[in-house]
């Protein structure tokens, strides 16, 4: 079967930069699915994306579908002919629908009887006739929240589309998509190269676009060029470029012909906290800041131009001119804000609602202060400093700097607290209270910061659940999922001895009657344990391991984590499968017994050697493992319990648990209950799958 490379390119208005990769990847995935559905063989789909185009290139695409044999079953032979042997209306109608006579039908014998069947070879359709509809379907499935119309057309897309090119090798694929007919026209860079040109073969893409149109359509090549160029430029400045992945992606999506340039700003602005300057450079201007080898911000930045100028100095000066007023604003806000202490802004928080039913940000700050003190006392942090940090935690929200540059909340609180001569761990806590801000983010360092970060998150969780506004579906306006997982990460990774029931109860109590949900503590704890489960699954922990631990509902996250790790390790042991099965058997036996078990095993009633051995080993394990369980050393404990496998197997092979003698039966059930209780101190391993 002959093959050719296939190209499709849509020339558009500027596409949303933050969505460009997602759109291109979805286009490739959708089109690949269409090819597979149509049974068209190929050797891979590559996507291209630039600000004004989306394109796909399919390698070695078959020129037609493979021929295939179809088989259409008709009525049963018994129903296909009447007593005289003539075709019934059912048989005649079926044959007509398939374009044959009844006599031309084959017969298919099955264990349920004989049936009429029509077999035919169907020739595969030419690929070029299928491609337009497949491409249209792939485009229709793109993640476009708000499609737009343009001109007098009724078609919709994320941005207006001006060109469509579909080539199967050298052949122009005839078809219409989004109101445009396919043509050989490709548009180049808006200001460089040829405005538009013709492409004669799919293999010429993207090289011809690069040569004639001055557009680097390969997204990954463009991204790598920008990253390497920015790093080299920073090195020439004697520094290191701050190339955040999300910003690199956005800049890559904004330019078709990247040109790396460096610029400077006045050193006087370095008196302003670096975070505020960086926010302006990254967030507003899409610049890459530069730091020296000690992590100090330099008065330089790197930016990416979308045009190769004969006079790059003009472009550099233009960017310096644009950023200067923003840096001046930051300088003004910083100097103005320092005239008033953070503490003096506490009262103004009373003018800002946290949530209508839950009070103001001042109310929240007071609760966080009390909650921080409660947590600090339990984890060995400075209670006075934790209280102070909690009280000041939201004061920077009332500063000019944070009102203008909202992403600087927390970090500006830290700088202002230092200016006010607050204790250093108080100042640091004001910044770190929001950590972790996203998956994989750093955690608070000091214990005071941990106390405030946990207090803030638990206050939000208890309050929002307390008024019955738990997250539903994808809607989570108060970021409760992030708050829950952040709290759990801090407790587990910092190994803090906190019980969720205790801290959530305290958080709910501090609302002092403002919340109406009486089951708020249970709901928040269950919600947090649910997030725990999800995070472990994402980390690759087996579901049955998580279920085995959840069955015990441990509410100390650090303890929960230790159990999960222990059960994961236990699951790898040779004895695990047999002991899990034995525990399941024990659970079933005990579940059917509705009487009262004895407090202890009566040695005099142990008749069979197998039950005597098991009783001795269980008693020995109870003594040996008590300190291990008390110290949370579950992995060591479960490893020791694996040694019971032989005794347990022999017991079930030799001993009739449900003996006719009531005393013997009760004694054996008590022995099994003690065996089960040993394992349950870690997890319910009966839930482990084979």
Curated annotation (Swiss-Prot):
UniProt KW Protein biosynthesis keyword: yes
EC number: 6.1.1.14
Reaction(s) this enzyme catalyzes, per UniProt: tRNA(Gly) + glycine + ATP = glycyl-tRNA(Gly) + AMP + diphosphate
Main location: cytoplasm
Keyword line: Aminoacyl-tRNA synthetase, ATP-binding, Cytoplasm, Ligase, Nucleotide-binding, Protein biosynthesis
A GO molecular-function descriptor: arginine-tRNA ligase activity
One of the GO biological process terms: glycyl-tRNA aminoacylation
Compartments (UniProt record): Cytoplasm
Family: Belongs to the class-II aminoacyl-tRNA synthetase family.
Family annotation (NCBIfam families): glyS
Assembly: Tetramer of two alpha and two beta subunits.
The protein's name: Glycine--tRNA ligase beta subunit
Organism per entry: Tolumonas auensis (strain DSM 9187 / NBRC 110442 / TA 4)
Gene assigned in the entry: glyS
């Amino acid at each position: 079967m002959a093959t050719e490379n296939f190209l499709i390119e849509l020339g558009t208005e500027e596409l949303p930069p933050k969505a460009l990769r997602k759109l291109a990847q979805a286009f490739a995935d959708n089109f690949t699915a269409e090819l597979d559905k149509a049974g068209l063989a190929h050797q891979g789909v590559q996507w291209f994306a630039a600000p004004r185009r989306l394109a796909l290139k399919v390698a070695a695409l078959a020129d037609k579908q493979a021929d295939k044999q179809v088989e259409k079953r008709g009525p049963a032979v018994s129903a296909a002919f009447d007593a005289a042997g003539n075709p019934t209306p059912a048989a005649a109608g079926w044959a007509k629908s398939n374009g044959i006579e009844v006599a031309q039908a084959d017969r298919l014998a099955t264990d349920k009887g004989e049936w009429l069947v029509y077999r035919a070879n169907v020739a595969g359709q030419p690929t070029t006739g299928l491609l337009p509809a497949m491409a249209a379907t792939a485009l229709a499935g793109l993640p476009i929240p708000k499609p737009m119309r343009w001109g007098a057309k009724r078609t919709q897309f994320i941005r207006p589309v001006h060109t469509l090119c579909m080539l199967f090798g050298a052949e122009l694929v005839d078809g219409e998509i989004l109101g445009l007919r396919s043509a050989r026209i490709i548009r180049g860079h808006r200001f460089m190269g040829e405005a538009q040109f013709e492409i004669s073969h799919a293999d010429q893409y993207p090289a011809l676009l690069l040569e004639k149109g001055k557009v680097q359509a390969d997204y990954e090549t463009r991204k790598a060029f920008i990253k390497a160029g920015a790093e080299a430029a920073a090195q020439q400045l004697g520094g290191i470029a701050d190339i955040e992945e999300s910003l690199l992606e956005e800049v890559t999506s904004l330019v078709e012909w990247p040109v790396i340039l460096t610029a400077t700003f006045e050193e006087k602005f370095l008196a302003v906290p670096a975070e505020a300057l960086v926010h302006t450079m990254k967030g507003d201007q899409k610049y890459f800041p530069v730091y020296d080898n000690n992590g100090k911000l330099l008065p330089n930045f790197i930016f990416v131009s979308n045009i190769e100028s004969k006079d790059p100095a003009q472009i550099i000066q233009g960017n310096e001119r644009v950023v200067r007023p923003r840096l001046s604003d930051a300088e003004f806000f910083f100097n103005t804000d320092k005239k008033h202490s953070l503490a003096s802004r506490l009262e103004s928080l009373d003018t800002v609602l946290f949530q209508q039913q839950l009070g103001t940000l001042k109310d929240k700050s007071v609760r966080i202060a009390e909650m921080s003190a409660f947590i600090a006392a339990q984890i060995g942090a400075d209670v006075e400093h934790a209280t102070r940090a909690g009280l000041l935690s939201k004061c920077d929200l009332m500063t000019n700097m944070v009102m203008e540059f909202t992403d600087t909340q927390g970090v500006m609180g830290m700088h202002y607290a230092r200016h006010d001569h607050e204790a250093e761990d108080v100042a640091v806590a004001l910044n770190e209270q929001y950590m972790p801000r996203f998956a994989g983010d750093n955690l608070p360092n000091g214990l005071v910061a941990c106390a405030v970060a946990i207090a803030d998150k638990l206050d939000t969780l208890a309050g929002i659940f307390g008024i019955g506004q738990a997250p539903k579906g994808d809607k989570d306006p108060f970021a409760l999922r992030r708050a829950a997982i952040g709290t759990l990460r801090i407790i587990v990774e910092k190994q803090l001895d906190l019980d969720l029931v205790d801290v959530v109860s305290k958080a709910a109590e501090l609302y002092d009657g403002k919340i109406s949900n009486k089951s708020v503590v249970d709901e928040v704890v269950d919600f947090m344990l649910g997030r725990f489960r999800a995070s472990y699954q994402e980390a690759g922990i087996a579901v049955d391991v998580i279920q085995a631990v959840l069955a015990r509902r441990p509410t100390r996250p650090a303890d929960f984590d230790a159990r999960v790790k222990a059960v994961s390790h236990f699951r790898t042991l040779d004895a695990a499968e047999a002991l899990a099965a034995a525990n399941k058997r024990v659970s079933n036996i005990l579940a059917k017994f509705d009487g009262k078990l004895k407090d202890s095993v009566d040695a005099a009633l142990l008749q069979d050697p197998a039950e005597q051995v098991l009783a001795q080993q269980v008693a020995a394990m109870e003594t040996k493992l008590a300190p291990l369980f008390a110290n949370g050393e579950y992995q060591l404990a479960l490893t020791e319990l694996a040694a019971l496998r032989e005794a347990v197997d022999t017991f079930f092979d030799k001993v009739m648990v449900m003996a006719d003698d009531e005393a013997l039966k009760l004694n054996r059930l008590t022995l099994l209950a003690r065996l089960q209780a040993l394992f349950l101190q870690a997890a319910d391993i009966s839930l482990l799958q084979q």
